[in-house]
Amino acid sequence: MSDVARILKEARDQGRLTALDFAKEIFDDFIELHGDRNFRDDGAVIGGIGRLNGQAVTVVGIQKGKNLQDNLNRNFGQPHPEGYRKALRLMKQAEKFGRPVVTFINTAGAYPGVGAEERGQGEAIARNLMEMSDLKVPIIAIIIGEGGSGGALALAVADKVWMLENTIYSILSPEGFATILWKDGSRSEEAAELMKITSGELLNMGIVDKVIPERGYFTSEIIEAIKTAIVDELAELSQLSTEDLLEARYQRFRKY
């Protein structure tokens, strides 16, 4: 098995820590909030407020399940538009009260069902991209599994984008890439090599800003490393004026 195939397998592993795991382990007194105030709650997106070293932080994440029933409840981590609208509601609330935002991303992509399209999936994603680009508080986005397509990017327009070591971030799945390019989904491993989807490759290209090591570390050590990195980064970002924060975010994405 090639290195990229191993990483792809680990990124999709059902036993990986979820967004909710990180929210509860990293932040004190995490309180989950629900609903988009428009249609319904979406179990594929979690969000709420917690404290980090005494500072209030808004946490948003895309949640996969740990077993079949949980995955059915979470729609296998594929958000509907109401999930993205819930996320945006919480981020705008964070802006109102001056709370930084941390997002945890693990999704193969936004849900492509008929109902989701009828309720404006494309609009919901596009609005998140627009609003996050101008959100007047610090944002840190962390890929914790799969970072698939616009469904992942809708929570990743951030001042800093990080990845865990054994995760992926791509425009679409390797299977989808192979099907489109070669009409053969079985060539997914070959596609993954071409796509440059691993954390190391994306760090080298400047797409992500930090890779958090996983191999050889206990779960508790990984959680502590993420917590420390968030504390340090928020301390730096909080020193910037709103104008400088937004300009740096703008330039970060303009360079692509």
UniProtKB/Swiss-Prot annotation:
The record lists the catalysed reaction(s) as: N(6)-carboxybiotinyl-L-lysyl-[protein] + acetyl-CoA = N(6)-biotinyl-L-lysyl-[protein] + malonyl-CoA
What does the UniProt entry say about where the protein is found?
Cytoplasm
What Pfam families does this protein map onto? Answer: ACCA (PF03255)
Offer an example of a GO molecular function term for this protein: acetyl-CoA carboxylase activity
* Predominant place of localization: cytoplasm
Q: Does the keyword Signal apply?
A: no
Which pathway does the protein contribute to? Lipid metabolism; malonyl-CoA biosynthesis; malonyl-CoA from acetyl-CoA: step 1/1
Q: Which UniProt keywords apply?
A: ATP-binding, Cytoplasm, Fatty acid biosynthesis, Fatty acid metabolism, Lipid biosynthesis, Lipid metabolism, Nucleotide-binding, Transferase
Its GO CC terms are:
acetyl-CoA carboxylase complex
Residues forming the CoA carboxyltransferase C-terminal domain are 1-236
GO annotation terms (biological process): fatty acid biosynthetic process; malonyl-CoA biosynthetic process
Give the PROSITE patterns listed for this entry.
Answer: COA_CT_CTER
Q: Does the keyword Nucleotide-binding apply?
A: yes
Q: What is its EC number?
A: 2.1.3.15
Spell out the subunit comment.
Acetyl-CoA carboxylase is a heterohexamer composed of biotin carboxyl carrier protein (AccB), biotin carboxylase (AccC) and two subunits each of ACCase subunit alpha (AccA) and ACCase subunit beta (AccD).
Question: Per the similarity annotation, which family is this?
Answer: Belongs to the AccA family.
* Function in brief: Component of the acetyl coenzyme A carboxylase (ACC) complex. First, biotin carboxylase catalyzes the carboxylation of biotin on its carrier protein (BCCP) and then the CO(2) group is transferred by the carboxyltransferase to acetyl-CoA to form malonyl-CoA.
What name appears for this protein in its UniProt entry? Acetyl-coenzyme A carboxylase carboxyl transferase subunit alpha
